[in-house]
Amino acid sequence: MFWIAFVASLGGLLFGFDTAVISGAEKDIQAAFGLTDAPFWHGFTMATALIGTIIGALICGKPAQKYGRLLSLKVIGVLYLISAVGSGMIDDWYAFMLFRFLGGLAVGASSVIGPMYIAEISPSSWRGRFVAFFQFNIVLGIVCAYVSNYFIKHYFVTNGVAADAFLQPWQWMIVSESVPALLFTVLLFSVPESPRWLISQKRDSEAEQVFVSVGEKDVNAEMDAIRESLHEELNIKKERLFQKKFMKPILIAFLIATLNQLSGINAILYYAPRLLEQSGVLTGAFSDSMLQSVIVGLTNLTFTMLGMSLIDKLGRRTLIAIGAIGMVVAQGLVARGFYLGEFGGYTLLICVCAYVASFAISLGATIWVVIAEVFPNSVRSGGQVFGSMTHWVWSATLTWIFPICVGTELVAGMSPSVMIFGFFSVIAALSLLFAWWLPETKGKSLEQIQKELIKE
């Protein structure tokens, strides 16, 4: 079972890797495709994968149900591989965006099918931990991308790669994703299909073999429970999501997804090296912006783990409130630094890490838990799709417009970064109000939550 969880969780690592690897290459991509004076198209190029993510998350459900979780994951692995090799080796702008879009389809689909597969194949006693491990690997993938970018840049700069080299450093950064993508795709041939899907296809004997292989203690009871669950799903009264009685869960999902993205996390993850270079104080042992990005990624990883361990102890509201205060202070200090035009020592790096840490233990750790909890069974799948789509749409939008905002002086004589991080700080303050308004769901059954939120 641990092997299956490891293989499936590589999908999460690829999810995070694909999201962050572009950060180290974005300045060179801008120059390579002549987008230096075209911030609109530079932002669009960066957001292409996220546009694919929206579509991938929307369309993956039916293929996963018709052809199985395992085959769907194999297709996702192939898409990751094609995207990494294609976008890294191509020198045509349109083809580059097409390959990045294919990678985005894989990210969106894996965000749905990966956790689904792990949840369906894991023994009940380990299910929560293995699903959480997938989420953890997303953040680990971000760190791996930053580390990969740093070593590739360091190697090529140290060895003085010629301008007419086969591939430029930024291309190697993107191609590097092909290694975990190939490993993921090949290893998927060593793991079984989801037993829940097999039972839904009347392939009970195969499902029984899978349960035996993963160490399920009471195979017959588990299979009976799945059959009963499938029967209940067929008989659940399906309802429209968008009606008055569901307005509070809808509003909660919309607000937490919106605050999650508009607090500025993608601006940090996608543009970290460029942002850190703007401080003008890259000196000393950690002078390389790529290395500073690694520090940011490790901070994200550490505090994501902390948030996951505290979410059922302190509760959703408390974590969001604590994180909101930290984000307000950190983003406010970044805005102040840009306003004064000075960042002493590693002030910007410290502030960015403080923001990322605050985000990771709050909005980062709680978003998917809250969205999964607030909707009743009759509309839960639709509600989760709505919350997920809200998240991805804002993610793509922010990534797209960030280069435009950075290059637009809204107030004469004032750095655009002052306005941008001032805005992020205001959004963080609104997160504090959201935490005050949000009903606490810690320690409550889904039925209790439904009674509190749904007004017939």
Task: Describe the residue ranges of each PLM region.
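Conserved alpha/beta-hydrolase catalytic His-Asp/Glu region
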Residues: 217-218, 383
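Short, well-structured alpha-helical segments
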Residues: 219-228
